[in-house]
A protein has these predicted regions:
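Catalytic Zn2+-binding segment of zinc metalloproteases
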Residues: 111-117
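Alpha-helical ds-nucleic-acid-binding substructure associated with the helix-hairpin-helix region
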Residues: 39-96
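Short hydrophobic alpha-helical segments that form membrane-spanning helices or hydrophobic packing faces
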Residues: 105-110
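A short glycine-/small-residue-rich loop at the edge of a beta-strand within enzyme catalytic domains
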Residues: 81, 85, 115, 140
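N-terminal alpha-helical segment
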Residues: 87-90, 104, 145
Length: 181
């Protein structure tokens, strides 16, 4: 029996014309992550060191678990994720790695894949009208999020990295003040 999940309703909380301005105020260092992406995209896999650096960039808390993955497994799993044409396999295979949840998997795709992928993060989701992130991510939610972000980036004429920075920054500046008690 198959259960069809309802697509989430994403609604941008700010005007799309503000993307550049918001992204320019983003100050969470991502130069190292972007540099890793420049090396990984043509290689089509992560080394263990690159993997650990991006996992640390996303979440220091999960670092000990991420370090439990051996280099061969990291390379094998990330090669599948970065070379398969199957969208669901791209994201879900990454969660086979210890310490990698959907948000961290999205970081690995965001920086390492040739196609544009957003980073799934509570801040970005909030900027898209989702007050509480799902307790458990699944592919239908992820794919709706990817499609929404790709359309927004295209409509704004920006890269996925610029859109991600803008979504994160808007939440940082507004989420606490706009939350209802």
């Amino acid at each position: 029996m198959s259960v069809r999940l309802r697509d989430p309703h994403f609604k941008l909380r700010f005007r799309l014309t503000r993307v550049h301005n918001l992204a320019a105020r983003y100050a969470y260092g991502d130069d190292v992550a972007e540099g890793i992406g420049e090396v990984v995209r043509p290689a089509r896999s992560y080394t263990q060191a690159q993997f650990l650096e991006l996992c640390r960039w996303k979440s220091v808390r999960t670092q000990p678990r991420c370090e439990e993955n051996d280099a061969a497994l990291v390379e094998a799993v990330t090669t599948v994720a970065l070379t398969t044409p199957h969208e669901q396999l791209r994201i879900e295979v990454l969660t086979l790695l210890r310490g990698v949840s959907w948000p961290t998997a999205s970081v690995l795709l965001h920086f390492g894949h040739r196609d544009p992928y957003p980073i799934v993060d509570y801040r970005a989701l909030w900027s898209l009208g989702i007050d509480e992130p799902p307790a458990r991510y699944d592919f239908p939610f992820w794919w709706a999020y990817v499609r929404t972000c790709r359309k927004l980036a295209a409509d704004a004429g920006v890269s996925m990295r610029i859109l991600d920075r803008a979504l994160w920054q808007y939440s940082k500046e507004n989420q606490a003040t706009l939350r209802s008690p």
